[in-house]
């Protein structure tokens, strides 16, 4: 092998090795920030297709309805505990130590993100409340043939008289 060909081969191998190292570091970083979404039934019984349950200490997102009558607030702090259930009957307890969103209510849909504990409770770091199901974006309303118009102040005033 002549020196020029040997130099090209060394450069190609180094380039491929560098790309492989960058790709593996990128995949490792993405894997550590991955939040898998589960329903309460999937946490209790495992995923329907694989039977895999989330492990304790794993960061996950849980979506479901807040069980009516399950919310317990600590009067001396922001700590709140509530249960989240789904239509399949699964239920998981969620603890949260911050201000709840304004739309949060019992019987309302939520998504909670946090770490699953050894006891099966989710220690939430973020709670997102879903919007009212009756809300319809203007684009959807327009597609359905409904008209949503805002009255300006002069029209509201004349309508009131």
Curated annotation (Swiss-Prot):
Alphabetically ordered keywords of this record: Cell inner membrane, Cell membrane, Cytochrome c-type biogenesis, Heme, Iron, Membrane, Metal-binding, Signal-anchor, Transmembrane, Transmembrane helix
One annotated GO molecular function: heme binding
Transmembrane spans: 9-29
Record's GO cellular component terms: plasma membrane
Cytoplasmic compartment residues: 1-8
Main location per the UniProt record: membrane
Pfam families: CcmE
GO terms (BP aspect): cytochrome complex assembly
Chain sites annotated for binding heme: 131, 135
Protein location: Cell inner membrane
PANTHER family named among the record's database cross-references: CYTOCHROME C-TYPE BIOGENESIS PROTEIN CCME HOMOLOG, MITOCHONDRIAL (PTHR34128:SF2)
Family: Belongs to the CcmE/CycJ family.
Annotated function: Heme chaperone required for the biogenesis of c-type cytochromes. Transiently binds heme delivered by CcmC and transfers the heme to apo-cytochromes in a process facilitated by CcmF and CcmH.
Protein name as catalogued: Cytochrome c-type biogenesis protein CcmE
Originating organism: Shewanella sp. (strain MR-4)
């Amino acid at each position: 092998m002549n020196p020029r060909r040997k130099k090209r081969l060394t450069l190609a191998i180094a380039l491929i090795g560098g790309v492989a190292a960058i790709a593996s570091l990128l995949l490792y970083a993405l894997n550590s920030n991955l939040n898998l979404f589960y329903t309460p039934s999937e946490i209790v019984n495992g995923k329907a297709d694989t039977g895999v349950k989330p492990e304790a200490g794993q960061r996950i997102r849980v979506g479901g309805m807040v069980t009516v009558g399950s919310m317990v607030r600590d009067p001396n702090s922001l700590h709140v505990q509530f249960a989240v259930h789904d239509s399949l009957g699964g239920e998981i307890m969620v603890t949260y130590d911050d201000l709840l969103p304004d739309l949060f209510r019992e019987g309302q849909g939520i998504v909670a993100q946090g770490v699953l504990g050894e006891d099966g409770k989710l220690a939430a770091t973020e709670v997102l409340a879903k919007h009212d199901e009756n809300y319809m974006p203007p684009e959807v309303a327009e597609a359905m043939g409904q008209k949503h118009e805002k009255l300006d102040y002069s029209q509201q005033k004349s309508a009131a008289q």
